[in-house]
Design a protein with these regions (language model features):
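Short, compact, well-ordered microdomains
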Residues: 54-88
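Long, non-catalytic architectural segments outside compact domain cores
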Residues: 1-55
C-alpha cells in the first residue's frame, strides 16, 4: 500500500484510514476534529460508520501491524509510522 486512503463522513468530514480490520472493514479516524475512530464497513451502496473506542481502534491497528510483520510486508514501516502518529 503506497497511498493514503481517505473517506468523507457526512457529519465529521474527512477521515483517514488507520488500519484494515478485515472482512471488508477498515478503521478510520477524524482528520481535523477531536480524535474519533470509526469502523467503516464498505457496502455496494456506500459505507456504514460505527463509532468505536480508542482502545478498539488501537487493537485493530496492532493486529494489522503484527500481521504485516509476520508476513514480511513491504508496507510494515508505513503502517508503523501511521500507528505512531495516531496512537503515541
Amino acid at each position: 500500500m503506497s497511498a493514503e486512503r481517505y473517506i468523507n463522513h457526512p457529519t465529521f468530514g474527512m477521515l483517514y484510514q488507520v488500519a484494515p480490520a478485515g472482512k471488508g472493514r477498515d478503521v478510520y479516524a477524524t482528520l481535523y476534529a477531536q480524535k474519533m475512530f470509526f469502523l467503516v464497513t464498505h457496502q455496494p451502496r456506500g459505507a456504514q460508520f460505527e463509532v468505536i473506542p480508542y482502545l478498539d481502534a488501537r487493537h485493530h491497528a496492532e493486529v494489522h501491524l503484527t500481521r504485516c510483520r509476520r508476513e514480511g510486508s513491504m508496507d510494515e514501516q508505513r503502517w508503523r509510522e501511521l500507528f505512531q502518529q495516531t496512537f503515541i
